[in-house]
A protein has these predicted regions:
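Short, low-order "capping/linker" segments at domain edges
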Residues: 91-99
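Residue-level signal for secondary-structure boundary sites
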Residues: 14-16, 60-61, 95
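Short hydrophobic/aromatic beta-strand element in the GNAT-like acyltransferase core
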Residues: 3, 38-39
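Short beta-strand micro-motifs enriched in acidic
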Residues: 42-44
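An amphipathic, aromatic/His-enriched active-site/gating alpha helix that lines ligand/cofactor pockets
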Residues: 24-37, 54-89
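Active-site-flanking beta-strand signature of metal-NTP-handling nucleotidyl enzymes
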Residues: 2-9, 51-53
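Short, surface-exposed ligand-recognition loops at beta-strand->loop->(often short) alpha-helix junctions
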Residues: 9-20
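A short, glycine/Asx- and small/polar-enriched loop/turn
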Residues: 46-50
């Protein structure tokens, strides 16, 4: 299991755009229902910082880049971010119904 955490801070004036694009992306994921991944995005209390967690099962290719809505979200993010996003792999040491 591979888990990636992405941390993004967006410009306050783009929060509505970010969240609308994220909703479209997650709706597309719900429709496509790709197997072998789990993906979530959360907004932190400051209102402009987001954390996304992506788990991809071993042996599964990341299906996100195949979704037009994901590519549109990634493209928009270039304009919406206040600073470059950071990402890092996580090592899961325990989980209850999360991963």
């Amino acid at each position: 299991m591979n888990v990636l955490m992405v941390h993004s801070k967006v410009k306050a004036e783009h929060v509505a755009e970010v969240e609308a694009a994220a909703k479209r992306m997650f709706a597309a994921l719900q429709q496509a229902q790709p197997q072998g991944i789990r993906y979530t995005s959360c907004r932190l209390p400051d209102g402009v910082t987001y954390v996304a967690l992506l788990e991809i099962d071993d042996g599964v290719d990341n299906p996100l880049p195949t979704l037009p809505e994901f590519r549109a979200f990634q493209e928009g993010l270039k304009q919406w971010v206040a600073e470059p996003p950071t990402s890092e792999p996580l090592t899961v040491i325990g989980s209850y119904r999360f991963f």
